[in-house]
Amino acid sequence: MFKSIVCSVLAASLVNAGTIPLGKLADVAKIGTQEEIIPFLGGAGPYYSFPGDYGISRDLPEGCEMKQLQMVGRHGERYPTTSKAKTIKKTWYKLSNYTRQFNGSLTFLNDDYEFFITDDKNLEMESTFANSVDVLNPYTGEMDAKRHAREFLQQYGYMVENQTDFAVFTSNSERCHDTAQYFIDGLGDQFNISLQTISEAESSGANTLSACNSCPAWDYDVNDDILDEYDTTYLNDIANRLNKDNKGLNLTSDDASTLFDWCAYEVNVRGYSDVCDIFSKDELVRYSYGQDLETFYQQGPGYDIIKSVGSNLFNASVKLLKQSKTQAQNVWLSFTHDTDILNYLTTIGIIDDKNNLTAEYVPFMGNTFHRSWYVPQGARVYTEMFQCSNDTYVRYAINDAVIPIETCSTGPGFSCEINEFYDYAEKRVAGTDFLKVCNVSSVSNVTELTFFWDWNTTHYNATLLKQ
């Protein structure tokens, strides 16, 4: 199946692409060979399946029938943002203006290296067949979304066999919208899908997939005092090593940090990155945990505002589950950003909020939070609601792995009995108040998420934004 998808994507892209990104012959031996480092790139690199799957089968438990399916997905693999590209270019400027032969792990720059950001119009955008640096790149956001669609049909195709007309929802970020459209394309032309584009502007208030944007109370520097405790001398070690090998280069610890971003985004658009080979395995581990720390304390359980922000989408999800018997649509697919998914998972309780991460050292026992496990590019969180005999159950599948609710998993396939789930959900949102905690009224008078229910009459079509 995958081979046929590749062929169809290549054929369509060849028709639409003016210039084919052939890349260099040397790329052939390297492309797709660095998958072992992807989990250490903090979610900036390509999609991969959740490593801690507990061995639980993704199959529907025997004798059960799926009643409703929800999915919240992240946009696919992409180029860096404009701001991130600025820092990468700053480091590239130092390297490209170095007048001597490179030594050590930078020797690849002697071999007619082509910087991976060849056109600024690609910044912020999904990586595609047409805008990749190499035609053989297996990690494009375009291919990821289309492959996801085919895997969706293989896993859940029976859910849409008799429901060929339905809506798919996306934020109006262009890369999220593109991911949704590529996913729809991957489903095939047998479906009549209405793509609803929901604004992520702060004026949308609660009626959004991106509640964090409607939260003026959000403090982007929160918990910096904790994060500052983390030992980042490994970045100095990287810079010193490169400078020692290359006299007069004068890279800084900031440059060393930037090289990790360079590595991740180049893999997204070239299929591999020689920059990734600069780092030792220990350095990758230290960088990865630094990303975990930052996420935990600024986008996850370590920031007390997050549970309220995530409750906006979680409450809507629970409402859809409760209305499963009366809703004409039983598949709800949405595409947004990593921050929104992290907020959502925090409210659900999938991310452990009982034990704060330490900044004093890298913990190897008892640490269950790894940013890139939850939100690699192309991440997807499924909510499955199924009936077995006369009882109904709910469970979550994240990036191809069933992740049970630890305190409610005695049902078939480690699911949670529906009434127990509703009790659990009520406890999770107790004390949360998105509108009040975020001071939403200062930017919007929209107090409810309604697009799942009124899309057929409102027809959401927000202007696409390159962000």
Positions of PLM-derived features:
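Fungal secretory targeting signals
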Residues: 1-21
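Signature for phosphate-centric chemistry
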Residues: 18-167, 171-332, 336-467
